[in-house]
């Protein structure tokens, strides 16, 4: 019987406070997270940003218990999905591959090879595709595949995007419905979709489909809610988690919260539409920061819809995705990782950065430059790093 490996891909997150700095470094080292024209400076810049942001990020993780629950929840999702698939007669084993923290994709690939898996289905835990999330994970997996003759022999099928999956839409709608019915005035409760933002240039210059898929997804959920409730609530879509001075997708979540409060909205049902697990953006950014902004602007009842986690209907929806992928037309790893023609990324391998002879001189020069910049800003209290929000 064919042994199928289900590779669940996600972002990853620091499980302890001391992991925050290295996690941020891995995140900002990815040219699909921060795109710069000179690839040599990618890793030095990642070191600088992660160093300057570590303290603030550590405080955020401390406020939710000292670390991210993302690995624990993703591994629970993997176990539940494996169980559901086996009940359906699929000889499946689930694996977790995190992009920026443990267990890394490379570790999952090693386990897949050791277990004698015959076929792999790749399922990113991002309902909506973006070059910076699913795309980055697909391309990391392709890089590992190209470098590994044994792994290259394994048939791989990919699920590129699933924002319109029936189980996902139904699960989201049901959890939103439950919160709406707890409001004092359910028919007038305002549904507030908040998605993780991406730079506007990703969509307008690079052709990222993320914005379209987020918007289509929110409409599908609203349609499902109307069938269940018999009425349409007012709703708004916004984007959160912006970093740096570059313009990101708008409207920004904090701005819309202020506008809704000032326009008289009293009951808000907040929906983290692009997140399928509880993590820092839901537990700290939404539950603490955005809730405080809402209260300051007169929104009395701030209700946040919980993340899907291992919600049974959601797990069944994921299982449907896998079985359809196995039975339907093949989407290869090359197809899934393909970028729009306009995207320009810079392979880090072409640029040395580390403690070796070829890099040591440049390491010293860059480090000295960074040190001088930081020292000047600390002395004068102003400059580009303050403008970027890093100091």
UniProtKB/Swiss-Prot annotation:
Pfam families: Ferrochelatase. Its main location: cytoplasm. InterPro entries: Ferrochelatase (IPR001015), Ferrochelatase_AS (IPR019772), Ferrochelatase_C (IPR033644), Ferrochelatase_N (IPR033659). Fe cation binds at residues 196, 281. It catalyses: heme b + 2 H(+) = protoporphyrin IX + Fe(2+). Pathway: Porphyrin-containing compound metabolism; protoheme biosynthesis; protoheme from protoporphyrin-IX: step 1/1. This is Ferrochelatase. Belongs to the ferrochelatase family. GO terms for biological process: heme biosynthetic process. GO terms for molecular function: ferrochelatase activity; metal ion binding. NCBIfam families: hemH. GO terms for cellular component: cytoplasm. Keywords: Cytoplasm, Heme biosynthesis, Iron, Lyase, Metal-binding, Porphyrin biosynthesis. Catalyzes the ferrous insertion into protoporphyrin IX.
């Amino acid at each position: 019987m064919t042994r199928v490996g289900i590779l669940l891909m996600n972002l990853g997150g620091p499980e302890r406070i001391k992991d925050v700095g290295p996690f941020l470094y891995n995140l900002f080292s990815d040219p699909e997270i921060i795109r710069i024209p000179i690839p040599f400076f990618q890793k030095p810049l990642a070191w600088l940003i992660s160093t300057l942001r570590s303290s603030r990020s550590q405080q955020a993780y401390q406020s939710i218990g000292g670390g991210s629950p993302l690995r624990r929840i993703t591994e629970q999702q993997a176990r539940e999905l494996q169980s559901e698939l086996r009940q359906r007669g699929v000889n499946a084993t689930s694996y977790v591959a995190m992009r920026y923290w443990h267990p890394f994709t490379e570790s999952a690939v090693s386990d897949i090879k050791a277990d004698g898996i015959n076929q792999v289905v790749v399922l990113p835990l991002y309902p909506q595709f973006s070059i910076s999330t699913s795309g980055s994970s697909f391309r990391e997996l392709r890089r590992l595949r190209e470098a590994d003759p044994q792994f290259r022999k394994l048939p791989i099928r990919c699920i590129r995007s699933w924002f319109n999956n029936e189980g996902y839409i139904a699960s989201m709608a049901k959890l939103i419905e439950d919160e709406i019915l707890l409001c004092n005035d359910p028919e007038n409760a305002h549904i507030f979709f908040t998605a993780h933002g991406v730079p506007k240039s990703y969509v307008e210059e690079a052709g990222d489909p993320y914005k379209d898929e987020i918007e289509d997804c929110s409409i599908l959920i609203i349609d499902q809610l109307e069938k269940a409730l018999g009425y349409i609530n007012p709703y708004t879509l916004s984007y959160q988690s912006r970093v740096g001075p570059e313009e990101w997708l708008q409207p920004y979540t904090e701005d819309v919260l202020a506008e809704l409060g000032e326009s008289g909205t009293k009951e808000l049902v907040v929906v983290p539409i692009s997140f399928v697990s509880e993590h820092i953006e839901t537990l700290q950014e939404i539950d603490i920061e955005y809730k405080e902004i809402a209260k300051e602007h007169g929104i009395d009842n701030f209700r946040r819809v919980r993340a899907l986690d291992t919600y049974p209907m959601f797990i069944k929806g994921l299982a449907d995705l896998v079985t359809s992928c196995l039975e339907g037309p093949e989407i290869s790893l090359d197809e899934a990782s393909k970028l729009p023609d306009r995207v320009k990324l810079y392979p880090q391998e072409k640029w040395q950065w580390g403690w070796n002879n070829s890099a040591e001189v440049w390491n010293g020069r860059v480090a000295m430059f960074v040190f001088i910049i930081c020292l000047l800003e600390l002395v004068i209290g102003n400059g580009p790093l303050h403008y970027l929000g890093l100091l």
